[in-house]
Amino acid sequence: MELKATKITGLADHLFRHEAGKMVSVLTKIFGTENLETAEDVVQQTFIDALQVWKLKGIPDNPSGWLFRVAKNKAIDVIRRNKHSVQYNFGDDERLLLKSEYTLAPAMENLWKEEVIQDDLLRMMFACCHPDISEENQITLILKTLCGFSTAEIAKAFLTSDDTVSKRLYRTKEFFRQKK
């Protein structure tokens, strides 16, 4: 049983490093970069669910596909809960599709296609490299959000403290919230 849990945790770590950035990119397209923390929360909850479900039911045949499906469903839940909220600034192309229950599922399906995800990763990278954000903060956000590095790993690479990296991330996310 412990070997199975170790295997699942190792797989989840690997998938987080390789898939979380893609999920955050799509989710920030849906929710807007000013709601980056909402996107990260959805991704984190998706991985928590994966660890819990996979320990009970085993690893699915396509773990990445499972993660994307759960993240997509969680995003739909957030949209439904906040349908009338002005907090989420849906993109122009998605705004009408995501606000209608009839078009919500097909619109979400299109947003999670591989070629769209690649465009979203690039879009998110450009957003992280906004000229009003310092170079250190740009790199820190990209490493954390798109590459899946931990705060400790980033701190070690920058020869700085975890606290400094956390502050950089906070300031950058605050910039996006204010940019709304």
Language-model regions, residue ranges each:
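Short, charged helix-capping/linker segments at alpha-helix termini
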Residues: L3-H14, V24-V43, V53-D61, D162
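Internal acidic/polar
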Residues: V86-Q118, L122, C129
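Helix-turn-helix DNA-binding module
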Residues: C147-T164
